[in-house]
């Protein structure tokens, strides 16, 4: 049973911070050291001061957790942050520009009871890295707070929740935010008991699919085991932003792979394994360009296994299609993923079980081509966007995909609501 509850959200005080657009930041794992420095320097109340970036200070990693904890406590004492007296759900409508068009995504924020994966209430789709989990554990333990929502997915096939959220959006937003990258956020506090009861009841029998935030979820699991004493403890709940699978603003973008620093013999062996599995046709990048190649891969991939290959020079590319006489279904459900086929049947054969650690991952096809041109990479593989229905089928069946198989977009902003892990929900 899923226990999705309203939480006593902790929010920035607009009387002090004034402009919420200067508060929000991307998820921590999308923030490199340069962006972190810029946000900290230019925006004294930005959420990055609390959430941090993907890599803590390598010279003194504990310092970042202590600084975040101290600042968080100061902001609470100074009323920069104020906790809602009553528990609420929160609704965010995130409007953004994409490919010359406008899209909107809805995210419903609240607290999900933290449970082990074997309970099958929260379903993961990838494995985690221990250092990244430890980083988030230390932040939770230092601050006793969760600064960003975990993005997860649910299915509302009967459109039960949809009219409830539509009714909320019929009211004036509690907050409207225009950010510097042409995004528009509307934010509502859901405070009426009828809506809160209906939302809680709706999710009781709905599995929750983790989209972004596996490391944060597993950090919450460990924090719970170390600190929880009662079922209603805030430590037992992790803040999530739940997005419906068919939300028109939800996108799964492709994640590509690149390899560099391998020997000529290994590269030749990779080519041999590819030739054993795929039929190849050349693609002239000097005529059509890498974006056209990516679009063709996406189109061809609707009905078959397709991989694009870049290299060894910047104008050379191929489209690979899995040979028709290969019975890929015997490999199991994960073989629906080209990333799995590439990793398990090609790269691991050549590079061993650590093949995934040797790859560079990017959703920027042109960037990979540039790195081929500069000889930073020797070969790159372009993949199609992972189909949402295939994702739901594989993950719902208890399988986990290879690392960096999914790139959910848009990324949810950090800073709208903070979940305090002290007290009860």
Model region roles, listed by residue range:
Residues 1-425:
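Surface-exposed, charge/polar-rich loops and edge strands
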């Amino acid at each position: 049973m899923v226990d999705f509850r309203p939480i006593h959200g902790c929010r920035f005080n607009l009387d002090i911070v004034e402009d919420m657009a200067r508060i929000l930041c991307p998820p921590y794992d999308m923030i490199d050291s340069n962006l972190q420095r810029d946000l900290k320097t230019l925006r004294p109340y930005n959420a990055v001061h609390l959430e941090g970036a993907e890599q803590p200070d390598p010279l003194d990693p504990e310092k970042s957790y202590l600084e975040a904890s101290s600042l968080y406590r100061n902001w609470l004492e100074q009323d920069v942050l104020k906790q809602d007296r009553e528990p609420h759900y929160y609704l965010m409508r995130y409007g953004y520009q994409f490919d010359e068009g406008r899209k909107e995504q809805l995210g419903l924020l609240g607290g999900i009871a933290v449970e082990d994966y074997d309970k099958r209430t929260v379903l993961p789709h990838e494995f985690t890295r221990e250092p990244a989990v430890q980083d988030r554990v230390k932040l939770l333990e230092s601050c006793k707070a969760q600064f960003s929502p975990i993005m997860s997915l649910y299915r509302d096939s009967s459109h039960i929740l949809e009219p409830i959220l539509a009714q909320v959006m019929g009211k004036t937003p509690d907050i409207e935010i225009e950010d510097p990258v042409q995004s528009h956020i509307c934010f509502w506090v859901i405070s009426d008991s009828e809506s809160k009861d209906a939302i809680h009841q709706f999710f009781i029998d709905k599995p929750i699919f983790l989209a972004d935030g596996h490391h944060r979820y597993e950090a919450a699991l460990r924090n719970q085991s170390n600190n929880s004493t009662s079922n209603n403890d805030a430590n037992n709940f992790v803040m999530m932003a739940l997005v419906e699978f068919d939300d028109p603003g939800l996108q799964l973008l492709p994640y590509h792979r690149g390899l560099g620093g391998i020997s000529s013999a290994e590269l030749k062996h990779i080519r041999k394994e590819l030739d054993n599995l795929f039929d190849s046709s050349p693609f002239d990048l000097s005529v059509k360009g890498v974006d056209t190649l990516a679009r063709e891969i996406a189109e061809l991939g609707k009905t078959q296994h397709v991989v694009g290959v870049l290299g060894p020079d910047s104008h050379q590319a191929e489209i690979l299609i899995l040979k028709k006489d290969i019975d890929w279904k015997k490999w199991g459900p994960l073989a629906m993923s080209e990333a799995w086929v590439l990793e398990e049947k090609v790269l691991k054969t050549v590079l061993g079980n650590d093949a995934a650690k040797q790859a560079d991952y990017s959703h920027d096809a042109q960037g990979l081509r540039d790195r081929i041109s500069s000889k930073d990479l020797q070969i790159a593989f372009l993949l199609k966007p992972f189909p949402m229905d295939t994702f739901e089928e594989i993950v719902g069946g208890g399988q986990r995909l290879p690392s960096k198989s999914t790139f959910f977009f848009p990324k949810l902003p950090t800073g709208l609501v903070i979940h305090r892990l002290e007290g009860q929900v």
